[in-house]
Each structure stands twice: as C-alpha cells, then as structure tokens.
C-alpha cells in the first residue's frame, strides 16, 4: 500500500510561445532595439551611469516628457541625442525573430510596450508552481463528474458565476479541514536563461471571417521546444490518485475542448500533440481556464459588459514564432501545419512519472 505522500516529476515541453506575466510592462523608454536585438538595460545601473555623465537631470526630464512623435520618446533616441554609444548597463537582450510585428520585418523598432515575463529575486525568468497548478486544476475540474456538472454554476446574484464552494478549498468554520488543492503541491520551475525568451505579438483568428487580426500587444514569452521540469507532491490518497491520472485526464480534457471550440477553426491553425496536452499562461483563451461547457453563455454575458465583446465562442488565440522541427520515431515533425508561422498561444505538452524521494 502506498503512503499518502507521493512525488511526481512533470516534464513540460512548450509547443508554442508561453507568457507568464508579472503584471508589469516595459515602455519604449526602458528598452532599446538595435542590431536585431531588444536590449532591456537595468534601469538602476542606467541611471547611475547618467549621474556619472552628469546627464541625470536631462534623463529625468526625458522620462516625463510628452512629444507627439513617438520615435523621440524612445530610449535609443535619448542615447543618440546625447552621443552615448555605451551599452554596458546590465540587464539582458532578446534576439529578434523577424515575426514580432505584423507590419513588416523592419518595424520591430516601432514596438511601444512589452509585457514582462515573471522573474525571481535574481532577475531570472521562471514559471511559478501556481501557474502550472492553475492549469492542472482546470484539467481536473473538467474531467471529474462530481465537479463538472450543473452544480458548477452558482446562480445566486445578478450574474451566474463559477461555484467556488464546489471543491473544498481552505478552512471552513465548524467543519473538518478539507482542502484538496492544498494537498497538491507544485514546485516552481528552476530559472532558465533569457536566451529561451522571444517577443511575440497577439493575434486573434475569427471563425466567422476566417482571418487573423493582429493586435498591438507584445509579450516576452518562452520559445517553442523549451523543456521545463516541476515536482508535484501530493499529501492525500485522493490527491495522489488524481495526479497519477493527470495524463489521461489531460487527453480527455483536450478531446472535449477540441470538440467544443477548436473544431470551429481551420485544422492548419491547430497544433498536433506529441505528449499529454496542457495550456498555460496568458493569452491562451478563456475556454482553456474554466469549465467551458458550464461557462458557455456566462462568459459571453460577462464580455457583453466590456468594450471587446465575445461573438459566439470568440476567437482563437494565436501568435507567431519561427518554425520549429522536432525529431520523433516516425521522422521529423513540424510543430505547426501552416505557412504563416501561427502557433496556439500557451500550448504545451507534458510527461509525468512518480519518483522516489
């Protein structure tokens, strides 16, 4: 008989760009585009250098200045105007892919804002365990009959919403402590190199028009074919059983998700799976983060109160990145089936196995 405490190794393989944000953005006054690279200097070190060069006041005025011409509000403009060739300000660089902007390959320098990837205390990018845990929760919610039913919707109040009390979560007064997801503990990933990051643009593909529309939203994202590992520890029999079944549950979730949503879009925009499927991070679409069958109708009403409406089931969330080929037993396999460099934003695969600790 197995002990309550069990440990699993989850190996994640990104099939598309994945963005885990920290809620912050770089403005055009905080990064430099030149020589086919985006350079994000350490702004503290940058300011100290300006103090040394007696340009601190001038730089402060530049930061609060508003000019009609956006080009003149860029950090590169300040450097050029003050004849500063130095670039030793710490920070990091991200190489250009040529697909950052919808306009043309030479317009990457016109990007005004970049959503930051989350970083640890040492400034290194990583994936928090809470992000993976949220994706696991979505899979388990959609594949467990006692949660995936009519009780999943709370009709109390003006607008229906998810019933947060369906799954035991946290202490409840007068009740025995029961918190399933506290019994599923997901580690943070190890930090990875900035070389694994690319900049990507948001694209929305409409099933109604069969066209992809670019949006002026840019994200630091993990590039496709990046391998990242996590440890999952379970502390109860129920939690251990659910994680043991995570692979087949992920396949069941994807089968239903594809029938519900992905089937409405061209097959060449949908990526094939190599392992167990999962969607992670920002920009993968609302249906990948909820009980989609129960949320159908609720999400549309919620979006009706926003500036951007959801028509029917909404749009497919895509982005562009360079073509990647992976070797599989049957030969070379392209991660995408289209010639436009479109990937499903946030898509990944994983393998999982129990390990001894």
Curated annotation (Swiss-Prot):
The keyword RNA-binding applies. GO terms for molecular function: RNA binding. GO terms for biological process: defense response to virus. Keywords: Antiviral defense, RNA-binding. The keyword RNA-binding applies. Part of the Csm effector complex that includes at least Cas10(1), Csm2(3), Csm3(5), Csm4(1), Csm5(1) and mature crRNA. The Csm complex is elongated and slightly twisted with a maximal length of 215 Angstroms and a diameter of 75-80 Angstroms. It has been modeled to have a central protein filamant of Csm3 subunits along which the dsRNA helix of paired crRNA and target RNA binds. The filament is capped at one end by Cas10 and Csm4 and at the other end by Csm5; ssDNA is thought to bind to the N-terminal HD domain of Cas10. Encoded in a type III-A CRISPR locus. Belongs to the CRISPR-associated Csm5 family. This is CRISPR system Cms protein Csm5. It comes from Streptococcus thermophilus.
């Amino acid at each position: 008989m197995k002990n309550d405490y069990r440990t699993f190794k989850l190996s994640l393989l990104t099939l598309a760009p994945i963005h885990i944000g920290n809620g912050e953005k770089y403005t055009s006054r905080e990064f430099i585009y030149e020589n086919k690279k985006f350079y994000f200097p350490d702004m503290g070190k940058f300011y100290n250098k300006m103090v040394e060069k007696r340009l601190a006041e001038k730089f402060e005025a530049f930061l609060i200045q508003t000019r009609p011409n956006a080009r003149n509000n860029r950090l590169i403009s300040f450097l050029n105007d003050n004849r500063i060739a130095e670039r030793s300000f710490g920070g990091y660089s991200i190489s250009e892919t040529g697909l950052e902007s919808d306009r043309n390959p030479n317009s990457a320098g016109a990007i005004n804002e970049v959503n930051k990837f989350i970083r640890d205390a040492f400034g290194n990018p990583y994936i928090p365990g809470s992000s993976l845990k949220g994706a696991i929760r979505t899979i388990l919610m959609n594949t467990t009959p006692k949660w995936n039913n009519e009780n999943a919707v709370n009709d109390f109040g003006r607008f229906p919403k998810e019933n947060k009390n369906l799954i035991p979560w946290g202490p409840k007064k007068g009740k025995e402590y029961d918190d399933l997801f506290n019994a599923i503990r997901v580690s943070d990933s190890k930090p990875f190199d900035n070389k694994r990051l690319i900049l990507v643009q948001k694209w929305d593909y409409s099933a109604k028009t069969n066209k992809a529309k670019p949006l002026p939203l840019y994200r630091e994202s993990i590039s496709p074919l990046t391998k990242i590992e996590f440890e999952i520890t379970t502390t109860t029999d129920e939690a251990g059983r659910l994680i043991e079944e995570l692979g087949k549950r992920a396949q069941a979730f994807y089968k239903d998700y594809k029938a519900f949503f992905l089937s409405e879009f061209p097959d060449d925009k949908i990526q094939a799976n190599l392992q167990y499927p999962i969607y992670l991070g920002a920009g993968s679409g609302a249906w990948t983060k909820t009980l989609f069958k129960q949320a159908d109708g609720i999400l549309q009403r919620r979006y009706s109160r926003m500036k951007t409406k959801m028509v029917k089931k909404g749009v497919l969330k895509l982005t562009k990145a360079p073509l990647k080929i992976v070797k599989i037993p049957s030969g070379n396999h392209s991660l995408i089936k289209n010639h436009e460099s479109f990937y499903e934003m946030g898509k990944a695969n994983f393998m999982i196995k129990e390990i001894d600790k």
